[in-house]
């Protein structure tokens, strides 16, 4: 679900040349119901995300159907954030705003909004080659003190810890996913931070080449950055993530 929702958000930002919450939600529903943005369908979806999409599907008058109850402070909205910062790489305040707004689609708990904003701050500082204070504060933390479950606070801290203990993309990711528990999302957030800090060249080529739709994803990310920079019109398909037409 981490990758699928990331691709769904990425496509919407490209197609709309910015954040369109209704379109993002429609993409999320297409992933859940129509085998889109996933090679083999929606095989995993969080309870909070499912309930939010259910509410949106029943009444599409508002896209902001994120849950707010005390048990809904999960990590489902920070795991998909990376396209926002790639698109708004040169517009920090817009990026910070959209980071929070996209969370409200499925995860509207105050902690989810707060930590979406924290992720924005970490990434934008990393773009400038700086380590956020939340990463620096994790340097002396022992592995036994790190929790890697689905609670948004713990996921964020685990990702900061993995960055603090390493000095390159590969080692940060390996350390993060080996924390176990909610390994995919801790890895996704760590990858977002590490990618911003070390750059795309730091990602092992063999990892990229082994991905399903590797070429399409790489081209999509390039389009995302270009579109965010000049708002050029590009079209990607929803179904199967096939990249079939580019217009400018």
Cite the ranges covered by each PLM segment.
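Structured, active/binding-site neighborhoods that engage oxygen-rich ligands
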Residues: 1-248
């Amino acid at each position: 679900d981490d990758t699928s929702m990331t691709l769904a958000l990425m496509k919407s930002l490209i197609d709309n040349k910015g954040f369109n919450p209704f379109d993002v939600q429609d993409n999320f529903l297409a992933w859940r119901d129509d085998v889109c943005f996933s090679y083999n369908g929606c095989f995993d979806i969080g309870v909070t995300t499912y309930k939010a999409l259910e509410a949106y599907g029943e009444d599409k008058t508002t896209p902001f159907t994120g849950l707010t109850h005390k048990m809904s402070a999960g990590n489902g909205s920070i795991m998909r954030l990376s396209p926002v910062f790639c698109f708004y790489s040169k517009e920090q305040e817009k990026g910070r705003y959209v980071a929070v707004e996209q969370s409200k689609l499925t995860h509207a708990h105050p902690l989810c909004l707060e930590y979406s904003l924290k992720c924005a701050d970490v990434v934008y500082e990393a773009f400038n080659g700086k380590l956020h204070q939340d990463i620096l504060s994790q340097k002396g933390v022992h592995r036994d003190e790190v929790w890697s479950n689905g609670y948004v606070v713990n996921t964020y801290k685990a990702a900061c810890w993995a960055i603090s203990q390493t000095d390159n993309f590969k080692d940060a990711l390996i350390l993060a996913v080996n924390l176990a528990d909610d390994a995919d999302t801790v890895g996704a957030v760590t990858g977002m931070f590490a990618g911003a800090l070390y750059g795309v060249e730091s990602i092992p080529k063999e990892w990229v080449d082994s991905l399903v739709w590797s070429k399409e994803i790489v081209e999509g990310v390039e389009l995302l950055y270009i579109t965010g920079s000049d708002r050029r019109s590009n079209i990607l398909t929803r179904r199967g993530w096939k990249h079939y037409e580019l217009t400018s």
